[in-house]
Regions:
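Intrinsically disordered, low-complexity terminal regions
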Residues: 1-285
């Protein structure tokens, strides 16, 4: 009898699998012609965003979904172009649970000219961006950010994710509530902050501490690599760790295991590094 019950249960399960509807996928795309320096704003409630660049005078946007349809009863796409300014807003449906409780996914792929102002905001997704020059702002509520080759005024923020940026050039500000930060590039200005993660930063030749740099972790290790000719006033302090400086420094104030103040080369703008509960290491690039 037990074998019959098991057999019936197995047949019912197989029938359910066979008759289950396939996961739905949908997509939408549009190309926008631009002339000169463009402004692009992309916002999505719950999706991943990827930005790449090319030598072109157009912006191409491609939205793909799984377990969502695109349209009035599913994912809505609001888009507007006013000259060289383009706004894209991708909204998830109010009820967004799919088959057997599985939620759908949204992905936004954007191909842009190499020079433009970029503003990306996603509530709960990862963002990747590759060589773009302009005013750049990337914000995610609960995802990771990966950026490469961004130039200009750059702001990267994650509420609870990792930030990795390489080959940056210009003024960079990054912060995350609870993630690790890895950055390298040539900086005119550098601000990096994490509530509960480590910071690993490398400044390339040509970097300048003009308007001041600040690196802070509430509860993590900080490593900063600087070129040998960087001019700065150093102020490094940790509440519960050690500070090590492996570059030439002229001590002008405090020098002990947890705090260092002094000049790098001829001095200059203020380079402030602080950690509430982690070690600080300053090394040569």
């Amino acid at each position: 009898m037990s074998h019959r019950v098991a057999l019936c249960a197995g047949l019912l399960f197989a029938a359910a699998v066979i008759t289950a509807p396939a996961a739905h996928a949908d997509d939408w795309s549009k190309t926008y012609a631009v002339n000169g320096h463009a402004d692009l704003h992309v916002q999505t409630d719950d999706g991943n965003v990827s930005v790449t660049s090319a030598d072109q005078n157009e912006i191409y946007v491609h939205v793909t979904t799984t377990r969502y349809t695109i349209g009035s009863s599913g994912v809505s796409i609001e888009q507007n172009q006013n000259g060289n300014s383009i706004d894209i807003h991708v909204r998830t449906p109010h009820f967004h649970w799919g088959f057997w409780g599985s939620s759908g996914t949204i992905r936004v792929d954007v191909r842009v000219p190499r020079n433009l102002n970029l503003d990306v905001n996603t509530g709960d997704g990862n963002v990747s961006a590759e060589p773009v020059a302009g005013n750049i702002r990337i914000v995610t509520g609960d995802g990771n950010i990966t950026a490469n080759g961004l130039h200009g005024q750059i702001y990267l923020h994650s509420g609870d994710g990792r930030i990795e940026s390489s080959s940056m050039d210009g003024a960079l500000k990054v912060d995350t509530g609870d993630g690790h930060i890895t950055i390298d590039g040539r900086f005119d200005s550098l601000q990096a902050q994490t509530g509960d993660g480590s910071i690993d930063a490398s400044a390339a030749a040509g970097s300048k501490v003009a308007d001041g740099w600040a690196l802070h972790s509430g509860d993590g290790r900080i490593t900063l690599r600087v070129p040998s000719d960087l001019n700065a006033e150093l102020d490094a302090h940790t509440g519960d760790g050690s500070v090590s400086v492996d570059v030439p420094i002229t001590v002008s104030g405090t020098l002990n295991g947890s705090s260092v103040r002094g000049k790098l080369n001829s001095g200059g703008g203020l380079l402030r590094i602080s950690s509430g509960d982690g070690s600080i290491h300053i090394e040569k690039t």
